């Protein structure tokens, strides 16, 4: 599929662009201060998109549809400018490193920021250092409580056989064409989903902004033998990946949440963060809701706001090496068995039944939700 001309340029259109593939459309909303307003805008984008698609339909599931061959997946193109070519070569690198089908896994990215007025309600004179520390605390708490999002937003327990190809996995047969895990919440967030195991070696803990930036830059500058062996140029002598680093660019960091800062397209994200600090966070671990045309509802958005506000205002100690292991273990447990009633999560070094963990967390969210809201 090619990008319809009616949708404008995927390089410059701020509302409708493409992700990895030409057929993988990405809808982008502006910053909006209400769940209803955000949902209405997203719904409008869907209506406009459908009016421009002819006989094509949107696939409303995070895991890709059936593929005959990975060669059928056409990379997104952005023209011949330096910026456009860099975006295309980056995608060629993703295809080379991970395969095209993995890159067609899709989800919801939810950006969250606190207004200047709200920061002043928290602190009489909020410096950028204060804001950075609070956002990092939010990120740490999201990682600690990601089980909650997997439970409420996980919607991909099944995948077509063609997604796995010849990869090893522990999924079970479901019908003639699909594979699944009976108690899974999100195969998208599992080891067979949108992941890169080598990135765990970067040891990112979000305890300090400078530490985070240095780890990402180290990932860009550190060659990985497997990627190096693939070569920077293809058989025709054309670039097929930006570099042989663990990360080609900052955006290749696959995590459930990332700190972000807007700026000129010519500026590196790591430099923007280092110079200006965190402007907002990007929550990436949300599956597309297959039962809603827009992939997310206004009620879902309100729940995310509540969850993220809880993460922002709650105590958030630094993440230790031991807690990294606990967070990763809980993540694996929830993506693979999160629908099972006897699931246990590690909390403070000991196992707790998910029902007990859920009751405590729901009570905390309930107290926050009861606070009168002033817009």
Each language-model region and where it sits:
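Terminal catalytic/cofactor-binding subdomain
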Residues: 1-95, 102-108, 130-140, 144-147, ...
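A generic structural motif
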Residues: 29-38, 116-118, 287-296
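A short acidic (Asp/Glu
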Residues: 38, 69-75, 122, 292-296, ...
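Short, hydrophobic/amphipathic alpha-helical packing segments
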Residues: 42-46, 50-53, 262, 266, ...
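Loop-rich catalytic cores of soluble enzymes, especially ATP-dependent carboxylate-amine ligases
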Residues: 79-97, 104, 113-275, 293, ...
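Histidine-centered divalent-metal-coordination microenvironment in nucleic-acid enzymes
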Residues: 102-115, 280-287
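Substrate-recognition/cap regions that form aromatic- and gly/pro-loop-enriched pockets
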Residues: 274-275, 281-370
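C-terminal amphipathic alpha-helical interaction region
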Residues: 374-375
